[in-house]
Regions:
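Rhodanese-like catalytic fold shared by cysteine-dependent sulfurtransferases
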Residues: 2-10, 16-35, 43-75, 85-123
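Active-site flanking residues adjacent to catalytic metal/cofactor-binding acidic residues
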Residues: 38
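Short, surface-exposed ligand- or partner-binding patches at beta-edge/loop junctions that are enriched
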Residues: 80
């Protein structure tokens, strides 16, 4: 019985830990409803290629919350990174700060380009 209880508790912990993650989509998106495209990777990653017109807002930058303060919290934003993880983290921070517009997780650069129809700008 103890082993069963440990499995149940571990499963519940995993479910609650993953519940805050924001999934990214592979379905095409109507970009007309988004105010801005935000790349939350590092400047070095951004320099290797980014969506045309994307604004760099490094989620790992200590000033990330201050950068978010320059945005309209009621607007819709399309957010992407390298894998979808950091864009999900950025979205969670934005929600915690009171952002009420649609916050779309574009996932990785290639997926974000595919679903948005925006070209990747290469160096």
């Amino acid at each position: 019985m103890t082993k069963f209880l440990k499995i149940v508790v571990a499963s519940l912990v995993a479910v609650f830990a993953l519940s805050g993650l924001t999934a990214c989509s592979s379905e095409p998106v109507d970009m007309a409803s988004y105010t801005a495209v935000i790349d939350v990777r590092t400047p070095e990653e951004y320099a290797t290629g980014h969506l045309d017109g994307a604004v760099l807002m490094n989620v790992q930058d200590p000033n990330f919350v201050e950068m978010l303060g320059t945005l309209d919290p009621t607007a819709n934003y399309f957010i992407y990174c390298r894998s979808g993880n950091r864009s999900g983290q950025a979205i969670e921070q934005m929600k915690a700060l009171g952002f009420t517009g649609e916050l779309f997780n574009g996932g990785a650069v290639a997926n974000a380009s595919s679903v948005s129809g925006i070209q990747v700008v290469l160096p």
